[in-house]
Amino acid sequence: MKVKNIKIAIKFTEAFLEEAKSTMKKIMAGEKVSRKKGLYFENLDAMRKALTPKRLELLHTVKEKRPQSVYELAMLMNRDLKNVTQDLAYLERLDLVELKKTRDKRSKTPPSVEYDKILLEIAV
């Protein structure tokens, strides 16, 4: 089984702008540009606000327990349904979790995590 990773990095504004400038030059020159997939934050504080211990626990629980609904996830974690729903919506916007609605009698939204590891990269 192949391990799937997601990259999370801290990239300072200057480095981000320099990389964007370099990419634009390559595009203008007609060169092929490889797509870099990942989640980037400007600083460690921003990353900590996004990936709180509760949200990391939520990702782990989704991956390990594979709940069939948001309600089931909230019960597994002994957390309030509203808070779990808000955290899932936030993590979905960051592309860290996927929510797929089912077409059963009762509409369910099973969350899923499609990677095995989060790799953190911090430039010095």
Language-model segments: which ranges?
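Short amphipathic alpha-helical elements of helix-turn-helix/winged-helix folds
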Residues: 60-65
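Short, cationic-aromatic polyanion-contact patches
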Residues: 47-54, 69, 101-124
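A short acidic, leucine-rich amphipathic alpha-helix
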Residues: 72-76, 91
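Glycine-centered, phosphate/nucleic-acid-interacting loop/turn motifs that mediate DNA/RNA or nucleotide
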Residues: 95
